[in-house]
């Protein structure tokens, strides 16, 4: 009687493949994200309301807790915008519990092509604020962001987000 080596091999590959995929996802997709939050931008002056206009006096604030001060962290900011955003770059004033900074970054290249991730009519631009940020202690922290552009009412910005990621392995 002749055995079919191919069918035995195929019957072993299925469970082996599933096991390898599960092991990969359990070890490599462990979340080191400590905080991730988006805040929608909206403007209202009583007569007019808009969900994609950011007033220069409007501050977006994120409050979060650091439970482990040992590792360093990555601080990322995200700006979501539409094609209505009129400029190539953007200036932001960023303040956290420990310091403040003025940041310039580009949303479009020299040819006017949007940078970042495009999906569903929005463009999401990640901006690395810090790659090895060390918190002095555990506790509550805050991060505030407001735009520093010349327009008092900046159109095309829909959301601002912050993500804090623990560096390294435990």
Model segments located where?
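Bacterial signal peptide processing site
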Residues: 30-33
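Exposed low-complexity, polar/acidic, P/S/T/G-rich flexible segments that act as propeptides
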Residues: 93-96, 150-170
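Short beta-strand-plus-loop segments that form exposed binding edges in beta-rich domains
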Residues: 78-80, 145-151
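An anionic, turn-rich surface loop/hairpin at beta-sheet edges
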Residues: 103-134
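C-terminal motif of bacterial Sec signal peptides marking the signal peptidase cleavage site
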Residues: 25-28
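Coil residues (strongly favoring Ser/Thr
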Residues: 58, 94-97, 102, 138, ...
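Contiguous beta-strand segments within globular domains
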Residues: 57-79, 88
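Bacterial N-terminal signal peptides that target proteins for export
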Residues: 2-17
